[in-house]
């Protein structure tokens, strides 16, 4: 296959991947974990992915421990887990 053909194929695959919703792609397993504030009491706002609604919601994070379903911004949460 010529380099032009390979480039076209790569472009089409990239385009199709962008159109595929996250729900049908493999989602990070930690996106399904419940929010976990951890054992500390620093009380910072963070975001977690709520799998039933497929939305990112705010919760109070204690500042240490917890699990990986925790994001500093709603945007990072949505890009990682919601799409």
Swiss-Prot record:
UniProt keyword terms in alphabetical order:
Disulfide bond, Ion channel impairing toxin, Neurotoxin, Potassium channel impairing toxin, Presynaptic neurotoxin, Secreted, Signal, Toxin, Voltage-gated potassium channel impairing toxin
**Which ranges carry the BPTI/Kunitz inhibitor domain?**
31-81
Similarity section: Belongs to the venom Kunitz-type family.
Instruction: Tell me the organism.
Output: Bungarus multicinctus
A Gene Ontology CC term for this entry?
extracellular space
Q: Which InterPro entries match?
A: Kunitz_BPTI, Kunitz_BPTI_sf, Prtase_inh_Kunz-CS, TFPI/VKTCI-like
Record text on subunit structure and interactions = Heterodimer; disulfide-linked. The A chains have phospholipase A2 activity and the B chains show homology with the basic protease inhibitors.
Role played? Beta-bungarotoxins are presynaptic neurotoxins of the venom. The B chain is homologous to venom basic protease inhibitors but has no protease inhibitor activity and blocks voltage-gated potassium channels (Kv).
Which molecular function terms from Gene Ontology are attached? Answer: potassium channel regulator activity; serine-type endopeptidase inhibitor activity; toxin activity
Protein name as annotated: Kunitz-type serine protease inhibitor homolog beta-bungarotoxin B5 chain
Q: Where in the cell is it found?
A: Secreted
Q: Which residues form the signal peptide?
A: 1-24
Which cysteine-cysteine pairs are annotated as disulfide bonds in the entry?
31-81, 40-64, 56-77
- Which superkingdom? Eukaryota
* Expression across tissues: Expressed by the venom gland.
